[in-house]
Amino acid sequence: MEDDRDRLIVIVAGYPREMEQFIDSNPGLRSRFTRYIDFPDFEDQELSQIFGALCRKHGLSLTPDLKEKTLHHFHWKAENAGRDSGNGRMARNTFEKVVHEQADRLSKAGIYDAEALSILEAADLESPAEPMWREYRKSGRGYIVKCEHCEATYSWNSAIEMPVAKCDKCGREFNAEFGMLIE
């Protein structure tokens, strides 16, 4: 590393505690790795957006109920699942499980048409947050979206297909594909 330091970049990545143990494992590492970038865990809305992007990439659409249930699923995971909860990998794993459940549901029903294969439903997401989602729906609290530029808040409805919205306050566009729970 010393001989080529003007041409060499070494990047190591991992969870904070394990990276600290790695750096401490050899006295010479701390002086060689002098720059650190912390990436915070994704919020539940961001994990839902990653999930939505994976669905779009694979030509799949979500029912309004699944969009809501997804928010509750990632919210529950963030509060209960520990340090891996805000990890983008969790969104990918959830996507893969949902697609698997959809395939099971459709094959059991003998449905094989292209339209059905392109729609993911709330029943396709097995989630420990299901009771919370059902209670939240009964409460009538609804959902919101926030402009990430100016923090203006708007009501959000899962039945409206609007991945991007324009903020009335600052005039900039922001992601409105998934809302947030009203706490």
PLM features: residue spans?
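Conserved RecA-like P-loop NTPase ATPase core
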Residues: 33, 47, 51, 91
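Short metal-binding segments enriched for Cys and/or His
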Residues: 172-183
